[in-house]
Amino acid sequence: MKIYCATGNPGKLREFQLAGEVLDIDVEPLAGLKEITAPEEHGSTFEENASLKAAYYSGFAPGPLFADDSGLEVDALGGAPGVYSARYAGPNATDQANNELLLQRLGDNPHRTARFVCVIALAEAGQVKKTFRGEVEGEILHSARGPGGFGYDPLFYYLPFGCSFGEVDGPKKFDVSHRGKALRELLNYLRALGLPASR
């Protein structure tokens, strides 16, 4: 089966396509995404932003489309950066700038529990059908570790692996990640509707 994905983040797209290959699902990027004026993400929750994007971009897709909103919630910062994760250090902030600001705001605080959250919204012809949420718990390190991943991955320590998400390969991370969990929920939903699970 084929489903379209609306994301301009190459790291996210790689993860979604990797999962799709394993499950024999063709995850296609929405053609011409860069030329489409992006909607303003004014939601206060991941669910609101994912739904807003999915409903909007599905109007440009020839079939079912999903969009996600993902971020990091740090307990000691009251859940920040949350829905502002990608622009924590300002509009068009780099991963490095966001990571540096996060470490600065946490300082030496010993309470470093955090979670990655991903909400995927499925839509077709401008209508949101359902949302799917995935979370993974961890802690924020005092410095970045590992060359892999993207975003806050090098700062996110995952106890069962004994390392940061920046130190594990893509398939291993996706097995336990927030995005992997949310995408599997989406695929299970599609199968429950009786849609074919193969191309």
What is the predicted role of each segment?
Residues 2-4, 10-199:
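Anionic-ligand binding patches
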